Amino acid sequence: MLDIKFIRENKDIVKAGAAKKLIEVDIDKLISLDDKRLELLKITESIRAEQNAMSTNIAREKDENARAQMIMEMKGVKEEMQSKEEELKEVMREWQSIMVAVPNVPDITVPEGTSDEENQEVKVWGEKNTFPF
């Protein structure tokens, strides 16, 4: 599987390689999904940091009323975190399904053909084995 950084930097080469292998892959959709994935990762990490800070503050708080208020706020943060994580999981599923479909880029010396029948044997090494069955 190709690295997403390589795909971003060499979008045209990857598109041409997929076309050369007769594989249809939407590279633009992959990159937009990756942007969304990175954004959601950033958001979930910031919410998680906020959640951790609130947990620490709740533990330090002595006043029961203030503590109860903080716990109520924490529930809202937790719900937001869960919704963002669900959204991230969905984006990750789609992102991974496209990433798996992206083929490796063929070598530039590979001859082009429209089907498997047009493949050429470029080099033979060793002898072919014959089996008695």
PLM region spans:
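N-terminal alpha-helical targeting/anchoring segments
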Residues: 1-128
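Short, intrinsically disordered, charge-balanced linker/junction segments flanking boundaries
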Residues: 129-133
